[in-house]
A protein has these predicted regions:
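Positively charged, low-complexity terminal tracts
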Residues: 118-120
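Acidic-basic catalytic patches of nuclease active cores, encompassing PD-(D/E)XK
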Residues: 1-26, 40
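Beta-rich catalytic cores
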Residues: 31
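Long, intrinsically disordered low-complexity tandem-repeat segments
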Residues: 98-115
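Conserved catalytic cores of phosphodiester-cleaving nucleases, focusing on short active-site segments
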Residues: 35-37, 42-53
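Nucleic-acid nuclease catalytic cores
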Residues: 68-94
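Structural signal for conserved beta-strand scaffold positions within catalytic alpha/beta enzyme cores
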Residues: 23, 48, 75-77
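Short, charged, amphipathic alpha-helix that recurs within catalytic cores of restriction-modification
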Residues: 52-78
Length: 120
């Protein structure tokens, strides 16, 4: 995890106390998302963290993971614009690669993203 993504992880952990997070540091299974989350409804989900100014960069392995695991997988992007955070469902990974941050997100801002993940 890069330094900006590490800082992003700390921010997310601090501001989502109702989600139990496990940071995944896996070098053997390429493309595995950064985080495993668990909410009060006993639902597991994965989150790939990205910090992006314009284009979001994904490895082929990351794309493959979300294509193979489209349910309860998410990409959370920290952006420099006013909303700050954008949450995308993993099943839209190909659209996200093609359209970048112009793609409509399923959550905009910390509160909307947090509520989406807490209510799965």
């Amino acid at each position: 995890m890069s330094r900006p993504e590490s800082n992003f992880w700390q921010y997310l952990k601090k501001n989502t106390p109702n989600i139990s997070w496990t940071r995944i540091e896996n070098t053997s299974a390429l493309g595995t998302p950064d985080l495993l989350g668990y909410n009060k409804y006993k639902v597991f989900f994965t989150v790939e963290l990205k910090v992006a100014k314009r284009n979001i960069k994904f490895s082929p392995h990351q794309i493959s993971f979300h294509v193979k695991h489209p349910v309860n997988s998410f990409i959370l992007v920290k952006t420099p614009d006013a909303c700050g955070l954008k949450l995308y469902e993993g099943l839209r990974i190909r659209e996200l690669v093609a359209c970048g941050l112009e793609l409509d997100a399923c959550g905009l801002g910390l509160d909307a993203c947090r509520l989406k993940l807490e209510s799965l």
